[in-house]
């Protein structure tokens, strides 16, 4: 129940205020979520934004709005490399503050975009096991997952994990956690980072 969670965390959200004041001084006022499709970036991101009083954006939706096409249509029309070029351009041009940004799983192929997002805030990697990922994901192409010809979910996972780890400021392991549990870990990690700022 999202409202129940919001009320539960909303009561404690002031404790994070001082940490975020410090983080803002270090250009860390945005929180960018990265990870595989199905890791919960949008689900966790929406609740995280409510708890912190932040805005929320989903960069996949920004891409669809800019292109006036669905992700799967863009991939079909432009191919995976064409899609990545568009994804890089859109993410590299995001200009927001006090915002939780849920990114597409393939954004880590876009170095320009990732450097921009890192310079504008803290990057949180929502880590998920391949087994859990396989259970959560349905139609990959329908979700706009960028797969090369003949590529499997396992090989895609192995290819992306080092990139997620490369760009992450914070890693949150979601194994054995529901949305609420993952959110708690994210908040605690952000608070600890704010305390050190």
Where are the predicted features?
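NTP-dependent small-molecule kinase module
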Residues: 22-26, 47, 51, 161-197
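Hydrophobic anchor at the beta1->P-loop junction of P-loop NTPases
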Residues: 33
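P-loop (Walker A) phosphate-binding loop of NTP-binding proteins
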Residues: 36
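ATP-binding Walker
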Residues: 39
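Walker A/P-loop
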Residues: 42
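ATP-dependent small-molecule kinase phosphotransfer cores
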Residues: 61-107, 111-115, 154
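A glycine- and Lys/Arg-enriched "phosphate-lid" helix/loop adjacent to the NTP-binding pocket
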Residues: 119-162
């Amino acid at each position: 129940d999202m409202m129940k969670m919001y009320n539960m965390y909303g009561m404690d959200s002031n404790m994070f205020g001082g940490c975020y004041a410090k983080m803002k001084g270090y250009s860390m006022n945005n929180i960018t979520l990265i990870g595989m499709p199905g890791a919960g970036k949008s689900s966790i991101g929406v609740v995280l934004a409510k708890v912190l009083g932040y805005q929320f954006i989903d960069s996949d939706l920004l891409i669809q709005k800019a292109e006036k096409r669905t992700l799967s249509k863009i991939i079909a029309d432009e191919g995976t490399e064409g899609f990545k070029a568009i994804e890089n351009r859109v993410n590299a041009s995001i200009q927001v503050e006090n915002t939780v940004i849920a990114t597409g799983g393939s954004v880590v192929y876009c170095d320009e975009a990732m450097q921009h997002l890192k310079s504008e805030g803290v990057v949180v990697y929502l880590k998920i096991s391949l087994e859990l990922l396989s259970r959560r994901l349905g139609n990959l192409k329908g979700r706009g997952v960028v797969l090369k010809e003949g590529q499997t979910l396992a090989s895609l996972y192995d290819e992306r994990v080092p990139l997620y780890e490369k760009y992450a400021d914070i890693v949150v392991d979601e194994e054995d956690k529901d949305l609420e549990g993952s959110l708690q870990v994210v908040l605690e990690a952000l608070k600890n980072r704010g305390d050190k700022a």
